[in-house]
Amino acid sequence: EMIDTCLADFRAFYGEHMMNRTHPYEGIVSVLETLKENGVTVGVLSNKYDSAAKALIEHYFGDLVSITYGERPNIPRKPDPTSVLQLLDELGGDKETTLYIGDSATDMQTAVNAGLTAIGVAWGFRSAEELRASGADALAYEPSDLLPLFEYGVPDVSKAEKALTGYGFGFHYFATKDEAVSYLRDTCAGKSVSMGGSMTMKQLGFP
């Protein structure tokens, strides 16, 4: 009973203040506008309670998002695939042409459980390494990185990674391009570095 009372108080307070210090990541609105212009339908699935999720999406994105599902009574939360499959059905989409984009391990696991292609965004709350380990098929480091995935498809990076590690190369994932540059600078400082040789696309695992 105390938990129910606290939850009701929280929802009442959050309902009045949920826009405080809340704003879209820079570049997201532009990406959504481009997707809409190109006929891509967007839905949102959140573990935030349903009325709040709908209010936030409507306020910040309007008709750029077609459907929003939040937490609903008697419906399991992510990473259970029930809600995302319901959302996909309502949108009239199919698994083969749908990208599930998220910023957490829970999102990646939801995509895997639903049989969808998982795209991890590394500007959120989890590292690129965690997103990849949780099932991300590809990573985006800034919002504009998402657009080529819709236009050209998602490369199977795991094949390239497997091929490269087989040739003695190592893989590191970074949250930002600046982190990658800093890593290379620190690793190579004071060392003589040379590179040579070549690999075919087939050797990298691409057809």
Regions found by a protein language model. Give the residues of each.
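Glycine-rich phosphate-binding loop signature in dinucleotide/nucleotide-binding domains
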Residues: 38-40, 91-97, 153, 187-189
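The feature marks the mature, well-folded catalytic cores of soluble enzymes
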Residues: 156-207
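Substrate-recognition "cap/lid" segment bordering the active-site pocket of phosphatases
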Residues: 19-23, 49-101, 105-114, 128-132
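Metal-dependent phosphoesterase signature
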Residues: 2-30, 38-40
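Short, glycine/polar-rich helix-capping loops at beta-to-alpha or helix-loop-helix junctions
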Residues: 123-134, 157-158
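Substrate-recognition element of Asp-dependent hydrolases with the DxDx(T/V) motif
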Residues: 28-58
